[in-house]
From Swiss-Prot:
Gene Ontology terms describing biological process: bacterial-type flagellum assembly; bacterial-type flagellum-dependent swarming motility; protein targeting
Subcellular location, principal: membrane
Protein name: Flagellar biosynthetic protein FliR
Coiled coil: none
Record localization: Cell membrane; Bacterial flagellum basal body
Pfam family membership, one: Bac_export_1
Membrane topology reported for the UniProt record: Multi-pass membrane protein
């Protein structure tokens, strides 16, 4: 009984990191998922992780322990946000498409954040999450938080968050996110650009034709046709996004931790 009590502070640190990870991670962090389920899943995963990682020495609950708890929450939030930032490229691609289609005014509520999200972006994002479940990519996300304890132990008080390389890594991750969004939306956006160009030529040659009445349904039809044609390519990009997400999480751990 005494050994269990001595190990409880270290277990609580593991539980804090995993709970913070589940707050921001895609799929598990949705507001539609009950908080009791997330806490329970985080608890059982913390039990599994704690039974396999190297046990730290006995920890006292003092001001140093409060710093460790804050560090664990920060590590979990950073890992979850990096994973969400990579997959959020799908929503950004949808916002590019919505803006060109004329759907930018018709937003829906994002269940992840509660904020407004583009209509096509939310549709593609939901399809990406279902695809993630079908290929078991969510297992890789859980592997990421599990192996984080090998890079950043629970008794390591000060990870290298203040390093210049960390700021460069975050900027590079943002750059990768927008590049992926551009790659996913480029076929549809380019097609809509050609439609706008054709409508401009028609407006100059046939002034009697109201291009504003014809243009909106035409652009919507072309957009859906291009989405159907390019859907397989979009899923290939989404699969690469999953691989990039895991690679980004591991690079972050290698950067701020000690392997």
């Amino acid at each position: 009984m005494n050994s269990i009590i001595d190990l409880f502070p270290a277990f609580l640190l593991v539980f804090i990191r995993i709970s913070a990870f589940f707050v921001t991670i895609p799929l598990f962090g949705h507001r539609n998922v009950p908080a009791v389920h997330r806490i329970g899943f985080a608890f059982f995963l913390a039990v599994i992780c704690f039974s396999t990682i190297d046990k730290p020495p006995s920890l006292e609950i003092d001001e140093h322990y409060m710093l460790l708890a804050f560090k664990e929450a920060l590590v979990g939030l950073c890992l979850g946000l990096i994973a969400y930032m990579m997959i959020a490229a799908v929503q950004i691609a949808g916002s590019f498409i919505d803006f060109q289609m004329g759907f930018s005014i018709a937003n829906v509520i994002d269940p992840q954040t509660g904020a407004q999200s583009p209509l096509i972006g939310q549709f593609i994002y939901t399809m990406a999450l279902l695809f993630m479940l079908s290929v078991n990519a969510h297992h890789l996300l859980l592997d990421g938080i599990y192996y984080s304890f090998q890079y950043i132990s629970v008794d390591q008080a000060f990870p290298n968050f203040g390093d210049e390389k960390f700021a460069y890594f975050i900027a590079k991750s943002f750059n990768a996110m927008f590049i992926i969004a551009f790659q996913m939306s480029a076929p549809v956006v380019a097609s809509l650009f050609l439609v706008d160009l054709a409508l401009g030529i028609v407006a100059r040659t046939v002034p009697q034709l109201n291009v504003f009445v014809v243009g909106l349904p035409l652009k919507i039809a072309v957009s859906f046709i291009m989405l159907i044609v390019c859907m397989s390519v979009i899923f290939v990009v989404v699969r690469n996004v999953f691989s990039l997400t895991i690679e980004t999480m591991r690079n972050l751990l290698a950067l701020v931790g000690v392997s």
